[in-house]
Amino acid sequence: MTDLSHSREKDKINPVVFYTSAGLILLFSLTTILFRDFSALWIGRTLDWVSKTFGWYYLLAATLYIVFVVCIACSRFGSVKLGPEQSKPEFSLLSWAAMLFAAGIGIDLMFFSVAEPVTQYMQPPEGAGQTIEAARQAMVWTLFHYGLTGWSMYALMGMALGYFSYRYNLPLTIRSALYPIFGKRINGPIGHSVDIAAVIGTIFGIATTLGIGVVQLNYGLSVLFDIPDSMAAKAALIALSVIIATISVTSGVDKGIRVLSELNVALALGLILFVLFMGDTSFLLNALVLNVGDYVNRFMGMTLNSFAFDRPVEWMNNWTLFFWAWWVAWSPFVGLFLARISRGRTIRQFVLGTLIIPFTFTLLWLSVFGNSALYEIIHGGAAFAEEAMVHPERGFYSLLAQYPAFTFSASVATITGLLFYVTSADSGALVLGNFTSQLKDINSDAPGWLRVFWSVAIGLLTLGMLMTNGISALQNTTVIMGLPFSFVIFFVMAGLYKSLKVEDYRRESANRDTAPRPLGLQDRLSWKKRLSRLMNYPGTRYTKQMMETVCYPAMEEVAQELRLRGAYVELKSLPPEEGQQLGHLDLLVHMGEEQNFVYQIWPQQYSVPGFTYRARSGKSTYYRLETFLLEGSQGNDLMDYSKEQVITDILDQYERHLNFIHLHREAPGHSVMFPDA
C-alpha cells in the first residue's frame, strides 16, 4: 500500500526549525570558543541550578519511561504493528538482531568501560572504596548507567516514530507523535518548538559523544604514532568527521559507511574475546554471572535512589544525571534509526528486541573490560587506577597494555574507535538534516548540503566545548540541554497511548455485525461456480479487466451516492508504481476532524501454489484483488465479485468505520484528532 500522505513536492528545509536551531547552536558554539571563561562559569552555575531543581525529576522521569515501555509491550497493545496490519518486516530476524546489536556499540563504551568501574571502585557514592563491596557496586553502577533504563528511552522514541510514520503515514519527525494531543496545531508553533528541542538536545548528545571520541582517539594516536595529545590534533580529528560526511554525501558512499558499521561489530567482538582469553578467563566469567545477579537484585533500589540524606552532588552530576540526560538527548537520533529498521514488527517484538539485544552486548563489553580493570587494581595496579581516574581517556589503552601484543590490540582499538567516530558523525548529520527538513515522504533524506552544514555545526560545537572545559563541559551542557526534550517525551507517551486506545475502538467496531442483508442471486453461487472461483489464478489482463469493468464502476456508484448526500468524496484510479504492471483504486471519504474513510483495491501478485494444474502448465504468478483500509489489508479477495458484491463490501467497511467513530466519540477523553489520509 502506498503512502497516502505522499507529497510530490521536492524536499526542502523547515525554515522555522532550521534557522532557529541553527542560529542558537552556532551562537552557543562561537560564544564558547571566543569567551571560554565566561562560558565555563555560566555552564557551571546553570548545571548547579538544574541539578538542585530537577535532579529528582531526572530520576523519576527515567523510571516512568521504562515502566511505560514495558507496560505497553506486555499489554494488548503489544500486538499492534509498526505499520499496516499486512506489512512484513523488511529485514530477517537475524539481520534485524545484528543491526540492533550494532546499535549498542559506540566509542563512549571504550571510554567508560574502564573509567567508570575504576572511579566507582575508588570513590563510590556511598560506603568505603577499594573493598569487595565497592567492586560489586562499581560494576552494578556501570551496568545501570548503560542498562535497560537508557534503552527504554530509545525504545520509546523508536516505537512512537515507527507507529505514527508507518501506520498513519505522518512525517518521520518528533512532532508527529504529538498529533493525537494537538491535532493540526503541530504544524504551527507547538510542532516547531518540539522539533527545535529535539534538534538542540540531539546535537548536544552527539557532540558529547564525538568530544569523548576525539579525546580517546587523540590519545590512541599518540600512543601508536607519537602524535601530540593537543587541541590542534583534536581539531584535526573534528575536521576529519566533517570531511567524511562531505564525501559520504557527494560520492554516494553511504552504503560503504554502513559496511564499516558492520565491520565495527566484528572488531569489537574480537577485542572482547582477546581480553577474555588473555586475562583470567575463569574470574571474568564468574564476575559476569555475579554482575548479572547484582544488576537484577539492585535495579529497583538504584532506579529511584536520589541520595536525599547524604547527596553526593558532584557524583550525581557526573554520573547518573549526566547519563540520563545523555540518553534523552540521543533518543530522537537512535529512535529514528530503530524505527526505520523495524517497520512491520509488532510493538512487543520491537520493545523486547531493543531492550534485550543491544544490552546483551553492552553487558558483555562492560563486564569483561570493567572487571579486568578492577582485577588489575586489586592485584597491585595502584598506578593504573590513578591514571584511569585522572585521565579517563587513557584507561582503556592502559588496560590493553597489561596484555601481550599491545601494539596490535591498541591498533585494533584505535581503528574501531575511529570507525565508530566517523560513522556516528555522518549518521548524526543525516538525522539532524531530516529533523530540520520538510521531506516528501518517510523514506526520503535531507538534501546533501544540509547534511554537510550539520556536520560542520556538530564539529564547531564539539570544538567549542573542548576548548571551554574539555569533557566536563560536554557532560555539563548535556545535563542542561537534555532537560527540555525530557518533557517532550512525556507528551510523546501521552500521544502514543491515546492513539493506541483508538486501536481498541477500531477492533471493537470491526467485531460488531453490520446490518443483516438477504442473500441475492449473486450470493448463492452454484457449487461449480464457487469451485471455479477457488481454482482460478488470474493473470494481468483478466485482473485489469476486472478492475475496469467491475471494481471501479462499483466504487463510482458509491461515491456518487455519497456526494448526493453531502459527503466530500475522492475517487482515483492511480497508475502502477515502479516495477509494477497494475495500478490501484482509491476511494476517500472526508470525515472532518474524525478519521477519514479509506477504501482501496490493490492487485497483489503471488506465486501460484505448486499443487495446482496451472503451476505445472508453466504459469508462475497470479493476482488477488485485495481491499485495504487505512490500517492495512483486510485479507479478502474481490476477484470474480459482481458489482453489487463489491458495493456491499464497501458499505460493510463504511459501516464499521462509522461504528468506530461512534465508539471513539463516546469514549472518555476522546480528543484524539486524525491526520488527513
From Swiss-Prot:
Organism per entry: Escherichia coli (strain K12)
Mode of membrane association: Multi-pass membrane protein
Induction context: By osmotic stress. Choline is required for full expression.
Biological or metabolic pathway of the protein: Amine and polyamine biosynthesis; betaine biosynthesis via choline pathway
Domain of life, source organism: Bacteria
Single biological process term from Gene Ontology: glycine betaine biosynthetic process from choline
GO cellular component labels: plasma membrane
Entry keywords, A to Z: Cell inner membrane, Cell membrane, Membrane, Stress response, Transmembrane, Transmembrane helix, Transport
Role, per record: High-affinity uptake of choline driven by a proton-motive force.
Name the UniProt record assigns to this protein: High-affinity choline transport protein
Molecular-function GO terms, alphabetical: choline transmembrane transporter activity; transmembrane transporter activity
Subcellular location: Cell inner membrane
Catalysed reaction equations from the record: choline(in) + H(+)(in) = choline(out) + H(+)(out)
InterPro entries in UniProt: BCCT_CS, BCCT_transptr
Record-stated family: Belongs to the BCCT transporter (TC 2.A.15) family.
Regulation: The choline uptake activity is completely inhibited by the protonophore carbonyl cyanide 4-(trifluoromethoxy)phenylhydrazone (FCCP).
Ranges annotated as spanning the membrane: 15-35, 54-74, 94-114, 144-164, 196-216, 233-253, 265-285, 319-339, 350-370, 412-432, 452-472, 477-497
